Amino acid sequence: LENPEINITAVNDPFIDLDYMVYMFKYDSVHGRFEGEVSTKDGKLVINGKAITVFAERDPANIPWGTVGAQYVVESTGVFTTIEKASAHLKGGAKKVIISAPSSDAPMFVCGVNLDAYDPKHTVISNASCTTNCLAPLAKVVNDKFGIVEGLMTTVHATTATQKTVDGPSPKDWRGGRAVNNNIIPSSTGAAKAVGKVIPVLNGKLTGLAFRVPTLDVSVVDLVVRLAKPTSYEEIKTAFKEASESSELKGIVAYTEDAVVSTDFLGHHASSIFDATGGIMLNDSFVKLIA
């Protein structure tokens, strides 16, 4: 909505009606109340005077994207994450599909990291996960400047919609079935391994895990790496400062030396914000970085 180069023509949601959609857009427990105007008119969602067609199809193959001129579809259900499943959107007239999650077979791209590898022949691509979008630029800057021999990643991750407010059945992930509001819950994540897909030279060099914590938004990536080229923490800070100002990574990587906490980043547009005062170094080749 804020990008003048993007024209949102339609949205599909089979689970809520139009009036409820207006309510959910207007009020948000994390980001607060929407400051603009949102309403309905003639069966459409109207945001700041812009009418948006609303579909309510469970099967993406039945969504008539072509009738509203939608060329690019963001597949963000978390269900249709393979090329075969996401390609169903193409049947309705869409030209390209971007999966907002990791995919087992779709080409994966992270802004600032490997967009140069994009081939227009691709009709379905993955934009990876939120964690990978934070970790991959972090790893790229370090690897390009100092080289990564190996590393371990931990993400301290905010609550997600799949978690439970009270203990409940979760046969495939017993710990994931525990109440979110009073637990730190160990979990798996494929984010570190996914970095190997967008930075092939790091394939097999990184792995990681997650802790789900009772916060609503903003997560942390804690990356511990052994460097190929000895350096100092000051040189690492300089590398990230320069990256945040470069034409390649400006707006994707940000840099801060302030004594910030997680809520200070609510609504931040950067994918990866390097916390210069958050990291530590054991020696000139072994370092923990925070973003």
Curated annotation (Swiss-Prot):
What's its EC? 1.2.1.12
Could you tell me the Gene Ontology terms of the biological process aspect for this record? glucose metabolic process; glycolytic process
Q: Secretion signal: which residues?
A: none
Where is the site Activates thiol group during catalysis? H157
Query: GO MF terms on file?
Result: glyceraldehyde-3-phosphate dehydrogenase (NAD+) (phosphorylating) activity; NAD binding; NADP binding
Broad enzyme group: oxidoreductase
UniProt-annotated binding residues for NAD(+): D13, R58
**Active site located where?**
C130 (nucleophile)
Subcellular location, record wording: Cytoplasm
| Major site of localization recorded for this protein | cytoplasm
Spell out the protein name for this chain.
Answer: Glyceraldehyde-3-phosphate dehydrogenase
Q: What is the lineage of its organism?
A: Eukaryota, Fungi, Dikarya, Basidiomycota, Agaricomycotina
Which gene codes for it? GPD
